[in-house]
């Protein structure tokens, strides 16, 4: 299969092309039904003559080309309708009836605040052009009305509030929010790309529109990605402030699978300047070795790394409710545990050559001994709660 992507250097085009090439090159094996031979990338700097060749060869066309921020409103129609007409005429000249996808906009509904949108009018004209083309040629036509998009590689200070907020937060620039309660419907770029790959496999999600809302059914005139997120500007800004604070607090906010927070965090990180990609951790060091907190979570405890010098014993304490995993990743050590009030000692000899996780049981005093005379013992530790100096739940007692 040969695929033509117009607007290939834009935000959506770049993400789509890289994912198409990952499938083509066997790097993405989640789409075994897709056999991609070539990806034709067409953009403003592509010689126009190449469009003729691409249209002759293409087995599927993603038309992502368009104008978002013209110098004058007349350019909306030229960029969003004019090129679409050229593209379809070129396909016609080669009698190529391959499926064609159009990236339109929710503004094409011309409803509410979009009623007088020149951008929306140009997008609607492009839609009707595609639908007419489909009727005339019997080529499959897939028209997507995108809501607000966000994700990596989106240009800030252009046409995405999320991109601007992420960029400014990451680079310590101010953010202007006129109304924190303003709600946006947002589509994450990876969810959109997955939908476009579904479309390529002949499985688009079809719909019609009830106002601005897609109503999904198999015979719908339009297509839409099924997963979007409705979120307020205030919620976005609050999340970004928590992401920004993570290197200093070590606290990773809740980012459940599929959540907006998870997708926004990934987007935010893509805007970090080089100096923020790396950050220092506080190493608590003494004659015995060191202890460094790595990461804290809001509901799943915290991670730390402990280094014990040769011959050193650490620990010698127990907890009521706190419990831990100890995982030796380098060196040779002995972990001992004894239930408080009992004389029986549980012993586990561990080595970094064979990583094993050892429970530090509640109500058991425990220690960890470096058995080596020459090498440090390095242990990754997880505790089921963040350390609270006011309630440490830690009591000294030798094993």
Question: What is the meaning of each model-derived region?
Answer:
Residues 1-26:
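N-terminal Rossmann NAD(P)H-binding glycine-rich loop of SDR-like oxidoreductase domains
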Residues 85-127, 134-137, 141-144:
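Conserved Rossmann-fold NAD(P)-dependent oxidoreductase catalytic core, especially the SDR/UDP-sugar
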Residues 275-316:
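A short glycine-rich, His/Asp/Glu-containing loop-to-beta-strand
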Residues 339-363:
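Short acidic-glycine-tyrosine-enriched beta hairpin
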């Amino acid at each position: 299969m040969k695929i033509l992507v117009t607007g290939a250097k834009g935000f959506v085009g770049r993400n789509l092309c890289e994912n198409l090439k990952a499938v083509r090159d066997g790097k993405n094996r989640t789409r075994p039904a897709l056999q991609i031979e070539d990806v034709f990338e067409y953009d403003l700097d592509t010689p126009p003559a190449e469009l003729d060749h691409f249209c002759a060869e293409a087995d599927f066309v993603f038309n992502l080309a368009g104008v978002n921020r013209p110098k004058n409103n007349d350019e909306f129609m030229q960029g969003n309708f004019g090129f679409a007409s050229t593209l379809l005429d070129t396909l016609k000249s080669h009698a190529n009836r391959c499926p064609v996808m159009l990236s339109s906009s929710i503004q094409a509904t011309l409803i509410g605040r979009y009623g007088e949108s020149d951008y929306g009018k140009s997008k609607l004209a492009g839609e009707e052009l595609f639908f007419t083309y489909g009727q005339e040629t019997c080529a499959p036509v897939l028209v997507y009305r995108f809501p607000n998009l966000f994700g990596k590689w989106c240009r800030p200070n252009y046409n995405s509030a999320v991109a601007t907020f992420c960029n400014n937060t990451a680079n310590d620039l101010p953010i202007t929010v006129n109304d924190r309660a303003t709600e946006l419907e947002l589509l994450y770029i990876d969810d959109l790309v997955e939908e476009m790959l579904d479309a390529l496999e002949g499985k688009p999600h079809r719909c019609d529109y009830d106002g601005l809302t897609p109503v999904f059914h198999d015979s719908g005139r339009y297509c839409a990605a099924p997963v979007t997120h409705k979120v307020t500007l205030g919620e976005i800004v609050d999340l970004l402030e928590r992401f920004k604070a993570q290197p200093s607090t070590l606290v990773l906010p809740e980012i459940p699978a599929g959540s907006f927070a998870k997708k926004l965090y990934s987007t935010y990180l893509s805007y970090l300047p080089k100096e923020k990609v790396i950050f220092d951790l506080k190493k608590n060091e003494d004659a015995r070795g060191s202890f460094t907190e790595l990461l804290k979570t809001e509901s799943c405890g915290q991670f730390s790394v402990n280094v014990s010098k040769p011959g050193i014993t650490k620990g010698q304490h127990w907890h009521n409710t706190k419990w831990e995993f100890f995982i030796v990743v380098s060196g040779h050590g002995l972990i001992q545990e004894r239930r408080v009030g009992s004389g029986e000692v549980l012993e586990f000899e561990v080595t970094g050559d064979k990583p094993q996780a050892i429970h530090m049981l509640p109500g058991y005093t425990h220690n960890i001994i470096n058995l080596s005379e020459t090498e440090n013992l390095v242990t990754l530790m997880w505790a089921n709660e963040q350390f609270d100096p006011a309630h440490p739940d830690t009591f000294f007692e030798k094993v």
